[in-house]
């Protein structure tokens, strides 16, 4: 796949890429990638450490390409304020904004989980309980001693004490571990509860490794979640989380999201016609609607009145990155404006 930044000369690069795809054929696809913050990264100390032999333009290109491969691992390398996160971000107290954005980044990293044997220091420092120093120590320990093969080995990392381990352990995955629970988001403190749950449902850890516990949720519900939670010594929400993790050990929650929209041909503003159905990616959510990338180098606007249901704020139904179906309402070529709707014009 080819990643094209949405900044300077993006349109010309896209046309050149489409011509290349026509000539080469095969499975080659391209995607327009939001390059906000790529220039900030390319001029940073971190980029200079990662690519000392490259100039800033090549560093930006690498950052854009990596955003297509693994956006989370790449975006953690820049200050979230540099991404352009909202309508009034510069009107807010910058310290409060920074705290709020850092909290969101941390939540995202923790929700996905981190492979302790491949993660960069930039990604590790965003895990609860870790900071820049302990993240660097963890990577240095990994380079000196080889891959981690058990979660408890993380305790051997210099300056990473029991308290920090307690906070970070559930978010660090160890795929190389022979113990299947180390592959999951189950915290070491809940390992005993997970084993009690499996025993009560007539399953084993070997069954988890082999993917033979498809009916675990149904068995647990038959036994009664509250009674089972009491037997395992945890609350019902924790028990539910354990079941979810055991059913898909090592899963990446992002796998359940719609895949990015990859294209082979370029679309012009003049190609758009009212009523046309398109797939688009939400680029920004604002008070009066949402801007959606539909592949024509000009984001279209879905006004709040054209969302699928009545809401006080568009963020109740849409988030940046959502892949949605929209219909063209009107196109103003002179002013470069596109009106879109999420309400199917064919359904009455």
Regions inferred by a protein language model and the residue ranges of each:
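Long, highly charged, low-complexity intrinsically disordered interaction regions
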Residues: 49-147, 153, 162-198, 236-264, ...
């Amino acid at each position: 796949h080819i990643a094209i930044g949405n900044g300077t000369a993006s349109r010309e690069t896209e046309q050149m890429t489409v011509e290349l795809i026509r000539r080469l054929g095969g499975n080659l696809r391209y995607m327009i990638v939001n390059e906000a913050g790529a220039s900030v990264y390319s001029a940073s100390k971190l980029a200079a450490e990662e690519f000392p032999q490259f100039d800033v333009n090549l560093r930006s290109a690498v950052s854009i390409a990596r955003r297509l491969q693994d956006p989370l691992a790449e975006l953690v390398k820049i200050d979230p304020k540099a991404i352009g996160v909202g309508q009034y971000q510069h009107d807010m107290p910058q310290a409060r904004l920074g705290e709020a954005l850092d909290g969101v980044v941390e939540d995202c990293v923790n929700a996905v989980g981190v492979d302790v044997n491949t993660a960069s220091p930039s990604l590790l420092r965003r895990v609860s309980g870790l900071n820049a120093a302990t993240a660097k120590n963890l990577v240095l320990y990994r380079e000196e001693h080889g891959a981690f093969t058990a979660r408890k080995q993380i305790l051997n990392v210099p300056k990473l004490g029991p308290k920090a381990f307690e906070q970070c352990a559930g978010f660090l995955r160890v795929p190389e571990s022979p113990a299947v629970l180390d592959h999951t988001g189950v915290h070491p403190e809940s390992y005993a509860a997970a084993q009690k749950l499996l025993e009560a449902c007539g399953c084993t850890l070997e069954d988890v490794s082999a993917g033979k516990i498809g009916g675990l949720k149904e068995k647990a519900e038959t036994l009664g979640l509250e009674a089972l939670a009491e037997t395992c010594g945890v609350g019902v929400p924790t028990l539910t989380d354990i079941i979810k993790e055991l059913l898909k050990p090592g899963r990446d929650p992002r796998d359940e999201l719609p895949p990015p929209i990859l294209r082979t041909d370029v679309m012009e503003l003049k190609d758009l016609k009212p009523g046309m159905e398109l797939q688009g990616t939400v680029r920004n959510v604002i008070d009066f609607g949402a801007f959606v990338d539909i592949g024509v180098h000009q984001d279209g606007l879905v006004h709040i009145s054209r969302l699928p249901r009545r809401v006080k704020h568009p963020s109740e139904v849409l988030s940046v990155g959502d892949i949605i179906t929209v219909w063209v309402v009107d196109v103003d070529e002179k002013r470069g404006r596109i009106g879109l709707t999420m309400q199917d014009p064919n359904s009455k």
